[in-house]
UniProtKB/Swiss-Prot annotation:
Main location: mitochondrion
Organism: Locusta migratoria (Migratory locust)
GO cellular component, as recorded: mitochondrial inner membrane
Gene of this entry: ND2
EC number of the protein: 7.1.1.2
Presence of keyword Repeat: no
Reaction catalyzed: a ubiquinone + NADH + 5 H(+)(in) = a ubiquinol + NAD(+) + 4 H(+)(out)
Pfam family name, one: NADH_dehy_S2_C
Protein name: NADH-ubiquinone oxidoreductase chain 2
Mode of membrane association: Multi-pass membrane protein
Function in brief: Core subunit of the mitochondrial membrane respiratory chain NADH dehydrogenase (Complex I) that is believed to belong to the minimal assembly required for catalysis. Complex I functions in the transfer of electrons from NADH to the respiratory chain. The immediate electron acceptor for the enzyme is believed to be ubiquinone.
Single GO MF annotation: NADH dehydrogenase (ubiquinone) activity
Source domain of life: Eukaryota
Length: 342
């Protein structure tokens, strides 16, 4: 573990790499930003005291290196295309999108994400699910266009996210599969407009911050810990439930609003079949969130020793505020309907 000054250095370098990647005009500058970002997060995933914790950092480095190599090959093909007057524009764009999906952990390049997240801390999980997706998604948005390839990618993301989380007991892996499902929605929103996916990503990141703050503060890592947490008052469990259901997209909570905008936009663009399939499999994702939430409230057990280290003072102050943010969809949805009708 590094001291605060080293953490600040790596975090600053991480942010600089992301900003360089999304603001660069040439492809080489984008690649350089992604590499700075990678080299900055690797030390944050490692721990000098425990060599077993370094395993996710090694896995992450290997996958990101493969994706960077694919991006470099794509850039080379683009340069050769201009030199050789090559007319096939789909191959380099598909390679760039594939490399960015590998970096984000989107299906069908998702296999590393649940494994890495299950072995790292909650803060690192939050970074992998939010900040580390910004540069690849911005890069992917430069060359995205709805096609059969993209249709398959969107559906695979939503199906894998729905089915993969059903039999999981680790909260970190459940959030990883939820992230894969949300990536399917965000990729579909990229085909509509830049503002749509950015709004979706903002809401998604906000809800992830809320949920991970709860899990980190309450020292929760597995489902059985939630079920046996009779130490928590029913009000605290209810606030946790509202945040989880909001992330799942239950109407009329905040997490449903970006999904509604994406669905409405896709229907306007004559993609009704895609919307129906997305809704069907997202319902499965919502099911295991509801299963967690209602089981946590209904099931009561004796107090466990691991609960004594929880700092309840933080929860008493923060959870009502965070729960209120999760239910802001009630206000936002009504305002959105007024905008649609005007």
């Amino acid at each position: 573990m590094y001291n605060n000054s080293m953490k600040l250095l790596f975090l600053s370098s991480l942010m600089m790499g992301t900003y360089l990647s999304i603001s660069s005009t040439p492809w080489l500058g984008t690649w350089m930003g992604l590499e700075i970002n990678l080299l900055s997060i690797i030390p944050m995933l490692t721990d000098n005291k425990n060599s077993m914790i370094n395993e996710p950092a090694i896995k992450y480095f290997i996958i990101q290196s493969m994706a960077s190599t694919m991006l470099l090959i794509s850039i080379l093909i683009i340069q050769m295309k201009y030199m050789m007057w090559w007319d096939n524009k789909n191959i380099p764009s598909m390679m760039i999108m594939s490399s960015m999906m590998m970096k984000m952990g989107a299906a069908p390049f998702h296999f590393w994400l649940p494994e890495v997240m299950s072995s790292t801390s909650w803060i690192n999980c939050l970074m992998l699910m939010t900040w580390q997706k910004i540069a690849p998604m911005m890069t992917m948005s430069y060359c995205i266009k709805m096609s059969s390839f993209l249709f398959v990618v969107i559906m695979m993301g939503i199906i894998v996210g729905a089915m993969g989380g059903l039999n999981q007991t680790s909260l970190r892996q459940i959030l990883a599969y939820s992230s894969i499902s949300h990536l399917g929605w965000m990729i579909s929103s990229m085909t509509i407009s830049e503002n749509t996916w950015e709004f979706y990503f903002l809401i998604y990141s906000t809800l992830n911050v809320i949920i991970i703050f709860m899990f980190k503060t309450m020292n929760l890592f597995f489902l059985n810990q939630i079920y046996s947490a009779s130490y928590f008052k029913t009000e605290i469990k209810f606030m946790m439930m509202t945040s989880l259901l909001s992330l799942g997209g239950l109407p009329p909570m905040l997490g449903f609003l970006p999904k509604w905008i994406v669905m409405q936009s896709l229907i306007d663009n004559k993609m009704t079949a895609l919307v129906l399939l997305m809704i069907t499999f997202t319902t499965i994702t919502l099911y295991y969130y509801m299963r967690i939430s209602f089981s946590a409230i209904i099931m009561l057990h004796n107090e466990n020793s691991w609960l004594t280290s929880i700092k309840m003072n933080k929860l008493v102050v923060a959870l009502p505020i965070l729960s209120m943010i999760s239910t802001m969809g009630l206000i936002c949805t009504s305002n959105f309907m007024l905008l649609l009708s005007s």
